[in-house]
């Protein structure tokens, strides 16, 4: 069944997952600004005394209400300050992993002194944009990130331009392993998952380790909205059944609780989002445990889940008005369906039902309430799988769902790319009015 050699398409699939599935400490939008600030601070010899920062509306939306790990505070200013004073510019999405208690205290003092300003970049044509300008005496350094959470495109200091990506940006775009996703299909992804050597995808088990640890932490502590631990108590009280469906709900939401509540544990992210990584991982883990799957089966199911989620999200803007926990849960539906019966038709039906169910869920910024949407998406995924196992699904006669799952995905993504742009603007306006 399994092939010993890896063909170029499969190698591209593996590279795509390795590029998009990475550890991340803290919500990735404020972390992107923290990285910009850390990279800017690394260009200075003295201590950072002041920070000015500019972000895109979408990054502002996803950074306003989320807790920065280790600080107990929400928002972009504390992320920028801690990045500059305690961040590791070489650590990417884990920029804050080694921030000391002193760095946290100094960052809070900088905020209290009014030395951190975070503003909207206007005009801004980039969905994901963050720029941090840090000052030390008469010296300054400025770092700009565009397009991806860790994609530094320009470094400049008072002495001149240190780095600019403009010259080689087009070449990097050509060589990105994600390019193959524009010319593949779910059937090819499934064929890859079924036949690729286990050793080539063993690395995906790290997602289970990291996101499983977050889930356990969410059940132990009182993080965020503590949805997972609350529902676990309701099970003990007899108000919620102790079954597989509930286990998926509780353990997935608990991981998101810990993630959004500021736990100092990394998530294995997907497509630049910790919550998407959690959603693509934990439901699959729970079902794998239920059916007694070994590590190899778990790895194949996780690879199907994560790669399917990346495949769908690749057709979306990096940030949009569409809650991407829903698309990550479509990947989870594929992984769970594969564990139960492995048929392509079951996987396709489950994804189609997901599109007919949760496709209208909006993203109103990163916050503790993301765990609600993660839990809803995970539950919908399992419901869609249960229907598909009995050959029942939302069909092409209903709504935006088409008779072909690939067209259904395209229909969903076209909504986010076009029609939901105005929705996104309205969400940002509402959130901005609350901040005043």
Curated annotation (Swiss-Prot):
<protein>
    <recommendedName>
        <fullName>UPF0597 protein YhaM</fullName>
    </recommendedName>
</protein>
<dbReference type="GO" id="GO:0080146">
    <property type="term" value="F:L-cysteine desulfhydrase activity"/>
</dbReference>
<dbReference type="GO" id="GO:0019450">
    <property type="term" value="P:L-cysteine catabolic process to pyruvate"/>
</dbReference>
<dbReference type="InterPro" id="IPR005130">
    <property type="entry name" value="Ser_deHydtase-like_asu"/>
</dbReference>
<dbReference type="InterPro" id="IPR021144">
    <property type="entry name" value="UPF0597"/>
</dbReference>
<dbReference type="Pfam" id="PF03313">
    <property type="entry name" value="SDH_alpha"/>
</dbReference>
<comment type="similarity">
    <text>Belongs to the UPF0597 family.</text>
</comment>
């Amino acid at each position: 069944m399994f092939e010993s050699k890896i063909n170029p398409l499969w190698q591209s699939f593996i590279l795509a997952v390795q590029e998009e599935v990475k550890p991340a400490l803290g919500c990735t939008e404020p972390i992107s600004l923290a990285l910009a600030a850390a990279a800017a601070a690394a260009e200075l010899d003295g201590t950072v005394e002041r920070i000015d920062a500019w972000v895109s509306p979408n990054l502002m939306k996803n950074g306003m209400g989320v807790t920065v790990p280790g600080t107990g505070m929400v928002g972009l200013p504390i992320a920028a300050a801690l990045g500059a004073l305690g961040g590791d510019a070489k650590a990417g999405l884990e920029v804050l992993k080694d921030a000391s208690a002193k760095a946290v205290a100094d960052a809070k003092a900088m905020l209290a002194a009014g030395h951190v300003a975070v503003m909207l970049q206007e005009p801004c044509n980039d969905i994901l944009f963050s720029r941090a300008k840090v000052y030390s005496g008469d010296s300054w350094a400025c770092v700009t990130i565009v397009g991806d959470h860790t994609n530094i495109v320009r470094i400049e200091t008072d002495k001149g331009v240190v780095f600019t990506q403009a010259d080689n940006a087009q070449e990097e775009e050509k060589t990105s392993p994600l390019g193959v996703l524009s010319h593949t299909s779910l059937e090819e992804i499934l064929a890859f998952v079924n036949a690729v050597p286990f050793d080539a995808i063993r690395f995906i088990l790290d997602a289970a380790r990291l996101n499983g640890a977050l889930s356990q932490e969410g059940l132990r502590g009182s993080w965020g909205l503590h949805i997972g631990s609350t529902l676990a108590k309701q099970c003990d009280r007899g108000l919620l059944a102790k079954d597989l469906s509930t286990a998926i709900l509780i353990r997935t939401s608990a991981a998101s609780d810990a993630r959004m509540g500021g736990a100092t544990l990394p998530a294995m992210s997907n497509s630049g989002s910790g919550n998407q990584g959690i959603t693509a991982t934990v439901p699959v883990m729970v079902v794998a445990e239920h059916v007694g799957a070994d590590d190899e089966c778990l790895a194949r199911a996780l690879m199907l889940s994560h790669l399917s989620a990346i495949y769908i999200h690749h057709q979306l803007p990096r940030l949009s008005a569409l809650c991407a926990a829903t698309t990550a849960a479509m990947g989870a539906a594929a992984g769970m369906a594969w564990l139960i019966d492995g048929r392509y038709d079951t996987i396709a039906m489950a994804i189609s039902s997901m599109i007919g169910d949760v496709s209208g869920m909006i993203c109103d910024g990163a916050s503790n309430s993301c765990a609600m949407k993660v839990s809803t998406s995970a539950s919908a995924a399992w419901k869609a799988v249960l229907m598909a196992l009995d050959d029942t699904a939302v069909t092409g006669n209903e709504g935006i769902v088409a008779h072909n799952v690939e067209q259904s995905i395209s229909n969903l993504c076209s909504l986010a790319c076009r029609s939901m742009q105005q929705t996104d603007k309205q969400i940002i306006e509402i959130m901005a009015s609350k901040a005043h």
